[in-house]
Amino acid sequence: MAADGDWQDFYEFQEPARSLLDQENCNASPEPGAEAGAEAGGGADGFPAPACSLEEKLSLCFRPSDPGAEPPRTAVRPITERSLLQGDEIWNALTDNYGNVMPVDWKSSHTRTLHLLTLNLSEKGVSDSLLFDTSDDEELREQLDMHSIIVSCVNDEPLFTADQVIEEIEEMMQESPDPEDDETPTQSDRLSMLSQEIQTLKRSSTGSYEERVKRLSVSELNEILEEIETAIKEYSEELVQQLALRDELEFEKEVKNSFISVLIEVQNKQKEHKETAKKKKKLKNGSSQNGKNERSHMPGTYLTTVIPYEKKNGPPSVEDLQILTKILRAMKEDSEKVPSLLTDYILKVLCPT
């Protein structure tokens, strides 16, 4: 009894008596000694042992329920931003139409209409004269054959005689205005005067000419003779100059014709070479593996040479055309002289020292 009196002060800190539900939730079975002490009205000699520890209580709270027990409550879910937005009507209205909006058609918009009116653009129809039928290369080549065009134009030009040249020179002198009206007659004035006298003499009959000569004195006849000799000399010099100019023009024409003809031949040969190269590429087994090539270079090596050309103010000179004609002929023959001729052309024409 003394022991009970000593511990009486600490009974208020003792764990309260558990209810029947707590005992059922606890898996621990009561100890035999405790039951015996309880039946004997014990517990007087020590503290009553706790039925469950804290860990056991936690495990009991989160354990799955038995098949016969009541269904558990709905598990608690954390509230996130996504779960809040799923129930938001404004957010759903915005996201439902996202990606389904059609792009703006710029051509049919009102802004584009105003833009076109500001630019004032008008469609221009392509004229039929600018449309070429390039289906047939041969026909196009014949249409653009500069050599035949030039030759046909040359054949149509009539050849002038010496008398016609003289008459044209006289007409040019007569039609040309006098730049200065000086008292001293210039050479053109004297030539025009003599030409007029010659024309009057031609028009006059033979009888009137003889009568006029008979009336002249010896001094007047000598003066007329000197004037005629001077006119003949001047006309002869002018005729020689015009004939030399005609020879130069004919030579230039021949050089241009030969250049154009060689250029067309090289272009045709280059086209044939390209077609042959395409056919060779299609073949699986080339013929070059069966035999050796006797030439030091592959056929068509110099045929595709690119000739540099610097565009000047005027047309190329006759000397330049002659050099280019030599290079084109060597290219047509696929000759090994092409590099040397090309070097001379670059040093003499493009980069003269």
Swiss-Prot record:
Q: State the GO CC annotations.
A: axon; cytoplasm
Q: In which tissues is it expressed?
A: Expressed in nonneural tissues, such as heart, lung, spleen, muscle, testis, placenta and melanocytes.
Q: Which residues, renumbered to this chain, carry the PTM Phosphoserine?
A: 135, 176, 195
Please give the InterPro entries that the UniProt record associates with this protein: FEZ
Bias (Low complexity)? 28-38
The Gene Ontology biological process terms listed for this entry are: axon guidance; negative regulation of autophagosome assembly; nervous system development; signal transduction
Which ranges of the sequence are coiled-coil? 214-286
- Entry keywords, A to Z: Coiled coil, Disulfide bond, Phosphoprotein
Which superkingdom heads the taxonomic lineage of this protein's source?
Answer: Eukaryota
Chain positions covered by the region annotation Disordered: 19-49, 271-300
> What is the protein's quaternary organization?
Homodimer; disulfide-linked. May form heterodimers with FEZ1. Interacts with synaptotagmin.
Q: Which family does it belong to?
A: Belongs to the zygin family.
Instruction: Give a short account of what the protein does.
Output: Involved in axonal outgrowth and fasciculation.
User: What protein name does the entry list?
Assistant: Fasciculation and elongation protein zeta-2
Q: Which organism is it from?
A: Homo sapiens
State the organism's lineage.
Eukaryota, Metazoa, Chordata, Craniata, Vertebrata
